Amino acid sequence: MKQGIHPDYHKVVFMDSSTGFKFISGSTANSAETVEWEDGNTYPLIRVEISSDSHPFYTGKQKFTQADGRVDRFNKKYGFADKNAAK
């Protein structure tokens, strides 16, 4: 690799703004805000809006919607009844 062209890769603490959940990970992101981690070291703090602690997919609060196909949407739009549904 060429020297001096790659960003500095270091450990960063990410904090979920909605739940306060924190985790440490490697990143090239920089922040002026710092926080002391459980190991006693100080790391840059990056605030994120959503993480695995608050995302509906990971929390089990995911809502599924019925995705209609193109034909179903056409029939609903123009008022055609499904012949098989009447039987």
From Swiss-Prot:
Keywords: Ribonucleoprotein, Ribosomal protein. SUPFAM superfamilies: L28p-like (SSF143800). InterPro entries: Ribosomal_bL28/bL31-like_sf, Ribosomal_bL31, Ribosomal_bL31_B, Ribosomal_bL31_sf. GO terms for biological process: translation. It holds the Pfam family Ribosomal_L31. PROSITE patterns: RIBOSOMAL_L31 (PS01143). Transmembrane segments: none annotated. GO terms for cellular component: ribonucleoprotein complex; ribosome. GO terms for molecular function: structural constituent of ribosome. Part of the 50S ribosomal subunit. Belongs to the bacterial ribosomal protein bL31 family. Type B subfamily. NCBIfam families: L31, PRK01678.1. This is Large ribosomal subunit protein bL31B.
